[in-house]
Amino acid sequence: ESRNMINGYTTLSDNPELGLQRDSTLMWWDDGDEDLTRGLAVGSSRAIFDQHFYQRGRFGRTLSTIATADERFGGAGPVGVGVDYATGIRDTGDTMLSDLFGESSVAVVDFETLHATHEWVGSPATLSARNVLTHLMTDGTTYDLQQRMFARDGRPAAVPDSSAWATPVT
């Protein structure tokens, strides 16, 4: 689990379609003042885990949570790790994700490596983001939480060049 924990949505029902809205996720931060609003004292400080990731449509929730963490921690937020139903991944010493097991895959959402930018636009405030790096982990892949490096069969993957992307002309 995470020191910073997702504890559901702030509305009364589980609404994944609201996940990209600002403050739609109830978070327990590691630095919370009260026992009931603080994440676990053990667990990852480099990742925020979200369970049933694909099954319950939680990509938007994870994106907005990591954007909020980016703001909260001054641009040095943790990665989001989306683990699907009946799937698991080993977190070794809060440094390495490896040894995926189960029925599906794991997504890693990273705002820092490509210097993602984001803002909350419209009413209700909805996340708009650019340069968010997403890795999909399957058997034989690892993710170094310290270096923010994805590897397949022990070979690091090249970090994409985000400057090559341009806004489409309409």
Predicted features and spans:
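C-terminal and late-domain segments of enzyme folds
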Residues: 5, 10-170
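Beta-edge loop/turn motif
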Residues: 1-3
